[in-house]
Amino acid sequence: MAYAYLFKYIIIGDTGVGKSCLLLQFTDKRFQPVHDLTIGVEFGARMITIDGKQIKLQIWDTAGQESFRSITRSYYRGAAGALLVYDITRRDTFNHLTTWLEDARQHSNSNMVIMLIGNKSDLESRREVKKEEGEAFAREHGLIFMETSAKTASNVEEAFINTAKEIYEKIQEGVFDINNEANGIKIGPQHAATNATLAGNQGGQQAGGGCC
């Protein structure tokens, strides 16, 4: 299917926070309770619609283990959006967010949109990190924030789509150079066709005006 833009995402965070499950829920609308550890990088894609335009999301799910960190770093470059995930039932995954964020900002495009996600909101009885703590961290670092559940699908759609909306707004504001694919954005055939139609219409109007 033709798309107007392609946005590249990267999902980062500690091992076991539910990165692969979030991706699977978003792309396939299913939950897999037992998931093999991601080795290196896995990939998923899905089409969404923003402002009447088809947007293709190309999503890279990275390994959380320290031994794969150098591989993860190479995927920061060329990403327009990042989902930084922690597990609300494991305080240590929240404590490691600063390290992940520093890594992301050091190796990525400065305009990359980062969504902070507190995953496993269905496990409220085992919560170790308050929602207010996630909100405060996001405010302090200029991130978007949501709590999600890959198991129940709560807020999963919204997390991926709201990140895309933020990227799209930055394109409209001229923040992203969409002609530079290193920014994680690719112009699709639908966008090119629309522009060609607009140019043709403008040309026709100008020619018509010259006859009067």
Curated annotation (Swiss-Prot):
A motif (Switch 2) lies at residues 63-72. Its cofactor is Mg(2+). This is Ras-related protein Rab-2A. It comes from Gallus gallus (Chicken). One of its GO terms (molecular function) is GTPase activity. It is an enzyme of class 3 (hydrolase). The keyword RNA-binding does not apply. Mg(2+) binds at S20, T38, D61. It is a lipid-anchor. It catalyses: GTP + H2O = GDP + phosphate + H(+). CDD domains: Rab2 (cd01866). The keyword Metal-binding applies. GO terms for biological process: autophagosome-lysosome fusion; Golgi organization; protein transport; vesicle-mediated transport. The small GTPases Rab are key regulators of intracellular membrane trafficking, from the formation of transport vesicles to their fusion with membranes. Rabs cycle between active GTP-bound and inactive GDP-bound states. In their active state, drive transport of vesicular carriers from donor organelles to acceptor organelles to regulate the membrane traffic that maintains organelle identity and morphology. Switch I, switch II and the interswitch regions are characteristic of Rab GTPases and mediate the interactions with Rab downstream effectors. The switch regions undergo conformational changes upon nucleotide binding which drives interaction with specific sets of effector proteins, with most effectors only binding to GTP-bound Rab. A motif (Switch 1) lies at residues 37-42. Pfam families: Ras. A lipid is attached at C211, C212 (S-geranylgeranyl cysteine). PROSITE patterns: RAB. Regulated by guanine nucleotide exchange factors (GEFs) which promote the exchange of bound GDP for free GTP, GTPase activating proteins (GAPs) which increase the GTP hydrolysis activity, and GDP dissociation inhibitors (GDIs) which inhibit the dissociation of the nucleotide from the GTPase. Interacts with PRKCI. Interacts with TRIP11. Interacts (in GTP-bound form) with GARIN1B. Belongs to the small GTPase superfamily. Rab family. Its EC number is 3.6.5.2.
